[in-house]
Amino acid sequence: MPSTSKCNRISRVADEEEEEEIVAVSSDADESESESEVGSGAEEEDDDYVGESSDSAGGSGSGSGDGDGDEEGGRSDIGDGEGEGGGRRVRSACRGVRANDRERKSQNVDALVRGNLVVRRQPLIPRILSVSDAAAIARKPFKPPCQNGYSENNEQLARRLSARKRFVPWGSVQPFAVTNILPQSPAVSSDDSVENEESLPPGIEPLILWQPEGRDKENSNFSAIKVDHLLVRYLRPHQREGVQFMFDCVSGLLNDDGISGCILADDMGLGKTLQSITLLYTLLCQGFDAKPMVKRAVVVTPTSLVSNWESEIIKWLKGRVQLLALCESTRADVLSGIESFLKPLSRLQVLIVSYETFRMHSSKFERPGSCDLLICDEAHRLKNDQTLTNKALAALPCKRRILLSGTPMQNDLEEFFSMVNFTNPGVLGDATYFRRYYEAPIICGREPTASAEEKNLGSERSAELSAKVNLFILRRTNALLSNHLPPKIVEVVCCKLTALQTALYNHFIHSKNVKRLISEGTKQSKVLAYITALKKLCNHPKLIYDTIKSNNSGGSGFDDCLRFFPPELFSGRSGSWTGGGGMWVELSGKMHVLARLLGHLRLKTDDRIVLVSNYTQTLDLFAQLCRERRYPYIRLDGATSINKRQKLVNQFNDPSRDEFVFLLSSKAGGCGLNLVGGNRLILFDPDWNPANDKQAAARVWRDGQKKRVYIYRFLSTGTIEEKVYQRQMSKEGLQKVIQQEQADGKMQGSSLSTEDLRDLFTFHEQIRSEIHENLKCNRCNKDGCMVLDGSKFDSAATEHEASNSGENSYIDIGGFGAISGCVQKMNSSNQQIGSPSEEDLGSWGHHSDPSTVPDTILQCSSGDEVSFVFTNQIDGKLVPVESMARAATHRTHEVTVNAEKEVGKINSSNVPGTERQSLLGKNLKMMGFNLKNSSMKFPTKSRRMLPNCLQGMNKTSTSSDHQQTKKLHVISDASDDDFV
């Protein structure tokens, strides 16, 4: 039988265990019952227990005669009648307490299962300890062992450790979502905002998106909307303009009622992600009525960019928003994450999800309030309004839509209409009206055979369309990057086919299948298969050999072609086809030029290069070349997992690692990757869609790039590749419809008419460049030289004679001509006209002689395979280190030229051979050029860059050093500052 002393001991233990406890009751219980239950069950439980036991003890004590009510008295006289009555009261009280506990536990379990649990804080000892009002938490937050508390470095560790504690309530399979696991960032006070304003760097003004005026200014409910200074300090002028533009569109400030979304169509590298994050954070925190305009936002992006978006938001906002990124998650995790995001009381503000994941779970977002702002990255994925992804996103009940795309115009105006209609439904009418009123007249007016009336009508409709869409489409070209990034040169390199490629190409285009295709016409899939086969042949005959061996239908035009291949060339022992010392490289013109270019880069520079192709089989050839020549390389294609891709990018960008080549599939990694560790990029084969090539080419000329950038586009001369590139220029011309860049109201005609598409299966073997022939260039003759007659040449010659020198008249944009030593060799046809756009090849520099190309590496690598080169130099801003190196290089070049002249004078004189060496040394020393101890220090690798006449003059060098000097010698008049 329990005694009062035992009850007292129980009460003391309960008092010493904790100072507070959390009492949970069901929200649907009656209020009076809840208060009574909490009061009797939590606050008064131990007190009533102790009180009754004390009374019984006191009673028994008085019966013994001492009346003290102490514990000893209760023990000695507990056996009498009155003591037995007290014991019964104690047992009854204990049973009542246990019954209350069981009932309260049952109610709490039911509340947990139903999801209507209410958490309250109650004091354990109300007479001694009182609990002030505070936020209810279900457990204590994780406390890191370090004294400095949370930081960016250990926050992820805290999340991982805290995530292990999961409570699954009885009768449920879903874990109980516990809030406030991590301490939230404190709200920014007014004092902090003042400090932020003061912390803005000099010259940077606050960015105010909207401020009340007139009656709104007098209304206290309206407050100004301005961007947090945490982000303002990093925004460039064009990015501030972009944030303001997007805010005006999505906030409804435009007068047009049909506009609630926008398309940010800036070129790659202009910071579309940062601009959208800035607007996202502003709308999550502010609004016209001092309340957030957006409560939930969804960011939809390609799968490969989900983790990149998560890292960018964390980087710029530093944990100020609650976000959830669903990347490579299981189906159960995706469902759980979406449900957590869509809960009415969820603290999550941003959901980052891939296009495929959203399409599969789009039905869950149909409820009202599921999304207040939609951001679609790489929005050219929405170019077809008949896809399931487009339909799923279009059904989302969200009017505020922001589309991010560096290439809004990809193939035709119909695809452009799909993106516009998704952003602002109905703003251009339905598809039938748009096709009849806009698309047909514009396309007809762009044809070379269009009449004057058709051209005028096309110009009018184009101007009308531009006026409408420019209200909610903002596009800036990457010319703005010249103020922030190093100079860039784009080179279109035309490479001849080898004898084997020529024989295979002629056999294919004259085959029965191709003739039947041209005369009768077949399915489009058959045409694309033949085009793909020819493009693979231009890359390397090995790809055709594999096609024939595998009996693939794509090689039907290459029947009986095995006789063209050397015996057992690709069928060596153990399946090896690398015999002959790597002679397989020379079977392709483009591959041969690439192999030489990689060799010169590896030996003479510390540059890194990105090789891009549309075919994984071509990437296999690149990898084989790198293995044979022991070049370190990294490969990223469709088979690379999402988590591994960012690691490969970081590995390539790490300057401490010995990386050289990055093999990239344009389909798998052409979007969003930042490969600033490399400053050279080769597009080995063209794509029908210019957007894919532009996306891939923008991987290296981005924020963070410190070196000069070289972009190479390899094309096989006279083949289908040149025709594909001309088609790209035609599509790029269409993009000006949304930019209003037609000067003097005149439309620029298509570079390729519809009839020209039938000329795909022809081969112009004897010309230097089919593109140059079609341009009908009046700056060059058939040999690529300056036209020798005409009034234009006479006036140009007069101006040339009036100038001081040819070098002074040449505007060397970016300094590429000076560092490559080709300035004195250039004529007017080799020089570009102004700063042309990337599709205006007529104004680029035209080079039939590779020695006039402002690129030292390409000069050395061209060989006999390069037939023609187009160059476009884009100005930029060099970092101070490279600027100093460039100045030192120019000084070195000047001294070297003077030294060569002095050597020539002495060699042509009658000075005896025994005295020439000493005389030459004295003269060079007077000029400041001393081979042994010169005041002009050459770079570490400058030994190979000395002129031919000075090679080997330093007698202290060993024979091995002399051999290596001859091996690494560069045929150039000046060294490239990238060599330093």
UniProtKB/Swiss-Prot annotation:
Residues 951-962 have a biased composition (Polar residues). ATP binds at D266, D267, M268, G269, L270, G271, K272, T273. It is an enzyme of class 3 (hydrolase). InterPro entries: Helicase_ATP-bd (IPR014001), Helicase_C-like (IPR001650), P-loop_NTPase (IPR027417), SNF2-like_sf (IPR038718), SNF2/RAD54-like_C (IPR049730), SNF2_N (IPR000330), SNF2_RAD54_helicase_repair (IPR050496). Residues 593-758 form the Helicase C-terminal domain. GO terms for cellular component: nucleus. PROSITE patterns: HELICASE_ATP_BIND_1 (PS51192), HELICASE_CTER (PS51194). It is found in: Nucleus. One of its GO terms (molecular function) is hydrolase activity. A motif (DEAH box) lies at residues 377-380. GO terms for biological process: cell division; double-strand break repair via synthesis-dependent strand annealing; reciprocal meiotic recombination. Its EC number is 3.6.4.-. Keywords: ATP-binding, Cell cycle, Cell division, DNA damage, DNA repair, DNA-binding, Helicase, Hydrolase, Mitosis, Nucleotide-binding, Nucleus. Residues 253-426 form the Helicase ATP-binding domain. Residues 1-106, 828-848, 950-980 are annotated as: Disordered. It comes from the Eukaryota. Residues 15-50 have a biased composition (Acidic residues). Belongs to the SNF2/RAD54 helicase family. Involved in DNA repair and mitotic recombination. Interacts with MUS81. This is DNA repair and recombination protein RAD54. It comes from Oryza sativa subsp. japonica (Rice). The lineage of its organism: Eukaryota, Viridiplantae, Streptophyta, Embryophyta, Tracheophyta. The gene is RAD54.
